[in-house]
């Protein structure tokens, strides 16, 4: 699936950055989904040539503060860029991002009162998607406030001086230190998607999650039975790569290249992945479209057919 993601990245952005031999320069970093991460996740990423990920400080076990942590894996070290949760979230999900100077005043203590430079991490959909004109906000913030003539004491520094050793805390998420405990009630999570979510919604999310996990276990078991001695994982990954354009454009998926004994099961597995990886578990108001994705996937699985529209959500 990581290989499928790299292939999709090349297709999406029509990457023309090539090395001297004319080959694609593959991405070396990975923005993890909202799902929980553990050491196994990092082992797989490192084995596939990924060198760094973004994590929150709450996800790292370490004796020293740093901006970057080196985490051992089965093959090679992987580096975790530790982002500052409060200020990063204020940019991604806050409403006070129309005035850069006002934003800085509101969060100055988060920026100034620390022994290391703040590290902000925001996915690209933040810019001009969640917040129109966000690129101008960033432009002004960094050029006129964080650096430049107005603040001659602000300087960029080499990150290597900030690297310390650490370990990932299993089953945590960059959106919540409790991972899916936000909806399942595990790990004593009280985050509730940023607050303001009632008990009914929490129960609804938990029920959806448990049902999707049940469907996932069921379809994987049936795939093992249908495959017998055959390997179904690699054919599924290849098919997923083939369908990337259809999925990203909202077109119907094609099962023409899939063995007849796998077609229905591959379709169910794809819908399950969309439901379990959806941002809808974590973000948006109750009326937000993203909240409907897990429920829509459950409905499609119950009908054992694909939705009439595009399969949305997830990573």
Where are these regions (language model features)?
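CE4/NodB-like, metal-dependent polysaccharide N-deacetylase domain
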Residues: 2-32, 108-121
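Acidic, His- and aromatic-enriched active-site or binding-groove loops in soluble protein domains
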Residues: 3, 11, 15, 46-82, ...
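Catalytic domains of cell-wall/extracellular-matrix polysaccharide-remodeling enzymes
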Residues: 14-63, 126-141
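Surface-exposed charge patches
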Residues: 7, 43, 274
